[in-house]
């Protein structure tokens, strides 16, 4: 069994999925993953579907140099955003796989959320391109390893109402005692 970057606190209430050596851009996939981290599973799947339809965009926060601006980034408080279709499709596939794994474990699909998602760089695939004057340059791709864990949300237990402890000074205690004596 492969090791994951994060260990779940309750393995019985979580399901995982991973993809290794995927030929998809590391930078785009990292931004896609961070966009849905911590989201409910159904909400994340719907969002990624909207990204493919160009109705919403993926905010680019780290790898955002030379990226154009779009108004769709305002939703996340950024100006730079894109619609990385290939990355979205790979992440969608892993979300679907994790949902199937959760269903096999008997978890409630409506309570699942993305508790951990991580994208790592895989070894680069090297090719070459031929340039003018007999030169050769490298032509590399940046594949990714993606891992994600979906966890069932625990129902919040209502906190018991605290009794407010009133601290009285000796003068206040004396006054209350005097009032009780008068009333009795």
From Swiss-Prot:
Q: Which UniProt keywords apply?
A: Cytoplasm, Isopeptide bond, Phosphoprotein, Ribonucleoprotein, Ribosomal protein, Ubl conjugation
Q: Where does this protein chiefly localize?
A: cytoplasm
- Note the CDD domains from the entry: Ribosomal_L22
Query: Which Gene Ontology MF annotations are present?
Result: structural constituent of ribosome
Any single biological process term in GO: cytoplasmic translation
Domain of life (superkingdom): Eukaryota
Keyword Nucleotidyltransferase in the entry? The reply is no
Extract the SUPFAM superfamilies matched here: Ribosomal protein L22
- Glycyl lysine isopeptide (Lys-Gly) (interchain with G-Cter in ubiquitin) crosslink: positions? 46
- Keyword Thylakoid present in the record's keywords: the answer is no
Q: Tell me the function of this protein.
A: Component of the ribosome, a large ribonucleoprotein complex responsible for the synthesis of proteins in the cell. The small ribosomal subunit (SSU) binds messenger RNAs (mRNAs) and translates the encoded message by selecting cognate aminoacyl-transfer RNA (tRNA) molecules. The large subunit (LSU) contains the ribosomal catalytic site termed the peptidyl transferase center (PTC), which catalyzes the formation of peptide bonds, thereby polymerizing the amino acids delivered by tRNAs into a polypeptide chain.
Its subunit composition reads: Component of the large ribosomal subunit (LSU). Mature yeast ribosomes consist of a small (40S) and a large (60S) subunit. The 40S small subunit contains 1 molecule of ribosomal RNA (18S rRNA) and 33 different proteins (encoded by 57 genes). The large 60S subunit contains 3 rRNA molecules (25S, 5.8S and 5S rRNA) and 46 different proteins (encoded by 81 genes). uL22 is associated with the polypeptide exit tunnel.
**Additional comments on file?**
There are 2 genes for uL22 in yeast.
Q: What is this protein called?
A: Large ribosomal subunit protein uL22A
